[in-house]
Amino acid sequence: MAQVVAVCISEKKGERKTPVDAVELRENHGIVGDAHAGDWHRQVSLLAQESIDKMVALGLDVTAGDFAENITTSGIDLVNLPVGTRLQVGETLLEVTQIGKECHTRCAIFYQAGDCVMPKEGIFARVINGGVIKPGDGIKIVMI
């Protein structure tokens, strides 16, 4: 079963996010208290634990939030979800708006490993219905 492994926030853009016990998502805004929240298409970022594990296999000491993702998942193939897919995550509803992103500046992880998974395997979403998400919550595809 697909589920949430961790939820993470940061006060500033361009930094690693810190795992927290739960996050509150606000409709058409994102995660309350997170630097990336706002009226745009990348309100929430998701990255699979399986993607993080690829970097661990390269010898990096990385964990949830180190790639600046808000929601770390397991058991769902995020990168192959079409834009427009809706996901029920805990009590919230998210709509996938973007797969991957352009990496304008090479981050510390890129220089350490020569690669980074977030630009290729991270996805972004906007909040359709708000609520709370916490580790252990289920993830369901409700519309493709």
Place the predicted regions along the sequence by residue.
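Metal-cofactor-dependent catalytic cores
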Residues: 1-144
